[in-house]
Amino acid sequence: HGYKDKITNVKTNFKIPTFQDLIEWAVKQNKLKLLILKLRAPIDEKYLIPVMLEEIRRTVRKISPPPLFQFVISVPNKEGLELLRSPDSNFLFSFDRELPPSGIVNYHRFTTVPVAMNFKNKFSSIGFPRYSSATESNLDPWAVYKFVLTLDLKLRDNYKNATSNYINIISWTFNDEKKIKCLINLGVDGIVTDKPKMLREIALNMGKVLD
């Protein structure tokens, strides 16, 4: 495998990593606790979700010794989530919602924690719109994201107080330092970023204890 230059159409020597490559890298990371895998399939092809999960499990079963970290399988629709079952305790599931860039009227409708509560999941994730612009709407997408996230955080805390069960909320994808600081202050449990070293430095400077 390799990439082709879009202009010259010449194939490069860069190797496209496979899932096996990812797993081989992951098992070498001594401090790794979670590996988040996003499974994507159209709703009308949701039957592919459990098929992909089984392929993942088959690959993981070949690893010796077994990995010490857990897998979080993230799915963007409830229909796909309903099909996911695993007897392995190291596989966890998460409803994954990316907010639309505009058109949000009912903020509660876009929260993720209620879905996690319904499926008894330990994780939920909420994504910032990839293509967002304040000109598309009267509302700033970042302000909308924070509002929905704040609702989720309140639901998470209320759920914990009522049941002692905790739902970890993951925010994605953020590379802006100010936004990352804001997310940490709000109380998210994890942040997906393309700049992990920067994220770690920010968290340490803010007094967070990292494993």
Label for each model-derived stretch:
Residues 1-92, 142-144:
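Metal-dependent phosphodiesterase/phospholipase catalytic core, i.e.
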Residues 94-211:
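C-terminal active-site rim and adjoining tail of enzyme catalytic domains
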